[in-house]
Regions:
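A short beta-strand/loop micro-motif in the catalytic core of glycosyltransferases
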Residues: 27, 91-100, 167
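An amphipathic, basic-hydrophobic alpha-helix
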Residues: 1, 10-14, 80-85
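Carbohydrate-associated surface elements
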Residues: 102, 123
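Membrane-proximal helix-turn-helix segments that form the acceptor-binding/catalytic region
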Residues: 21-22, 34, 46-95, 105
Length: 179
């Protein structure tokens, strides 16, 4: 069995094809929406939810300059999506592991065979977590990557409407903007 994870940048989906041709089963754990959206995140200009490319035609990536606001980067993203098209990748992959039912549903909406989707949610062994009485505070906390696709802007908008503070812990492209 070949198990693929985050192969788009350093490696290539050709790994799935090579394994498949040799009769090796391929399991691919998805961590983003790259197989549906050249931008990875299904966000138009990093802000608005976009599912235009779900129909298989990735030309909207060019029209909207989805990749870094650049025509050249968008052309490269478009070409990559055309070369590694859905049918080709699906044929070479036996199982697609999705970390949520939402992702599995979106992959099926984008044309992937729902029978190949397996949902395996990310987990934590709560038995290994330290328990304690921390007392109730007047805030809630976000811990994670500070980037648009994580919804930090929405969190801050919501926090501004509530009588609670939000503490943000993490790093990423929005770190300086959030300070």
């Amino acid at each position: 069995v070949v198990h693929l994870n985050n192969i788009h940048t350093q490696l290539s989906p050709v790994l799935a094809e090579l394994a498949h041709r040799r009769g090796i089963r391929v399991v691919w754990t998805l961590h983003d929406y790259k197989l549906l959206c050249p931008r990875y995140d299904c966000l138009l200009n990093g802000r608005t939810v976009c599912e235009t490319c779900f129909n298989g035609d990735k030309k909207a990536c060019l029209d909207n300059k989805c990749m870094k606001g650049s025509r050249l980067a968008s052309f490269i993203g478009y070409r990559e999506a055309v070369v590694w098209n859905r049918q080709q990748l699906e044929d070479a992959t036996d199982i697609l592991i999705c970390p949520s039912r939402f992702m599995a549903d979106k992959m099926a909406q984008g044309g992937f065979d729902a029978r190949k989707m397996k949902v395996l949610c990310n987990f934590i062994d709560t038995g290994k977590c330290a328990k304690g009485d921390y007392g109730k505070g007047d805030y809630y906390c976000y811990i994670g990557r500070l980037s648009r696709e994580k919804g930090i802007g929405t969190l801050i908008d919501a926090a501004n409407r509530l009588p609670y503070k939000v503490k943000i812990i993490g790093n990423g492209p929005l770190a300086n903007e959030l300070k």
